[in-house]
């Protein structure tokens, strides 16, 4: 045998099993075995699969690498650490490749970014929204909500994006802007507080809601015509495509005590909503059909709850978020686990439970294309749950670590058959993680990892944002490794993809930094109502000769760049 540096299997003839009829003459059988005649479907004469891509030729040209899945994560620092006031993010929203981030600052509290196909982050513009601090935001899809649905007197011809911002005083602003040319403008303002007097009971003074304690908790698009907003315990639905005289009046308003979050069924029935809260039964979830009444699942049988001790049962159940994963399945967070319900089932029991055994789960996101459910908790862990085998699953555990092992003597037989290890940690958190607040210095009181915002990009990548304005982009890549060295093959003709060691940020060139727009139609108010927009993209940036600024560090600040400014018109019709 010729010596090579690649493995060569032993040349052994393997004859497939065949049925041979019994013959009386043994001599004929011996003669047939000694001849060179072979069965018609053996490897010697069956060449139907020789060109199949599944088979790989064991030679020097092909047997030099192997392909596996790896996690690729890129991080950007959206706000600098040298600022006198620390920027605390309040929400994040993504539509297609446009990313919107909001902070609790009085100025520059909205930033628009673009995630390119090369996984580069481009800052488009900075907007200052007047009023109280922003608590939640929502990018409305351009296809379903074009700005042209409003009169031409309220919008600019260049506007192509609508934004919803919820504030601490119960106000939701509808902003129209151009992603590349700026000129942001508030075209509608929805005051939720003036509709609460009819829904608040006068016999219970504690339910009296004042503008100081009425923050907008969540806003979400609804039925391609309007949006749903949550203020304290009240659920609002507005129709943006209705008559202009009735657009500021909600088409639905109801109070649900103890509600924490909601999710609209965006698959086939937008009139069906899932509600989670502290007063929706022991499981903390309810279904709201806008055409019928409220339904609360039955009490969960404690005997089937695996891994629940007495201390765990005595804790108050907390459900903070929910998400629809199909037209008939909804997932909700309950303390440190996830419950998946089938709304067609009548037994009052979840079809599957996912045990992360980390912190309290605070956010859920689902990727319909890959069938992956993402969860984030108060300890900073982000876990990806593979739900492709949901029909056969009863319990889900982590793939790695000691938390992936669970023993139950009473129901050990049941667990071994219906437990799937389907959870992978995407972002690892720590309960006592030290945070560098300035330069490389660490303060003793700067501990904890805070809240993680989750959202899905257009290509299925996961986007995370922590409370220190660190943006992360995570994706699963097919990576080729060299068999001999075990290193990643680069993309210079020898491999298809690889994990990059640096993140890139594209900004405008030096000539764009000194440009300032000063037109006559600008409008600004004094005090806290100074509304401005900094557009960092000029027409020169769209040219092909525009070079990107490449940073070698994985995290960096973009506040060093002097941005050009333009003032927003804050008049509301």
Swiss-Prot record:
Cross-link (Glycyl lysine isopeptide (Lys-Gly) (interchain with G-Cter in ubiquitin)): 553
InterPro entries: WD40/YVTN_repeat-like_dom_sf, WD40_repeat_dom_sf, WD40_rpt
Gene3D superfamilies according to UniProt: YVTN repeat-like/Quinoprotein amine dehydrogenase
Chain intervals for the UniProt region annotation (Disordered): 500-519
Listed GO CC annotations: cellular bud neck
Localization of this protein: Bud neck
Induction and repression of expression: Expressed periodically during cell division. Requires ACE2, CBK1, MOB2 and SWI5. Expression is also increased under microgravity conditions.
Record flagged with keyword Plastid: no
GO biological process, one term: cell wall organization
Keyword entries, A-Z: Cell cycle, Cell division, Cell wall biogenesis/degradation, Isopeptide bond, Repeat, Ubl conjugation, WD repeat
Compositionally skewed regions (Low complexity) per UniProt: 500-509
Residue spans of the WD repeats: 144-185, 315-351, 356-395, 397-448
Molecular-function GO terms, alphabetical: G-protein beta/gamma-subunit complex binding
Keyword Transmembrane helix in annotation: no
Annotated family: Belongs to the WD repeat DSE1 family.
Miscellaneous comment: Present with 3080 molecules/cell in log phase SD medium.
Role summary: Involved in cell wall metabolism and required for the separation of the mother and daughter cells.
Protein name: Protein DSE1
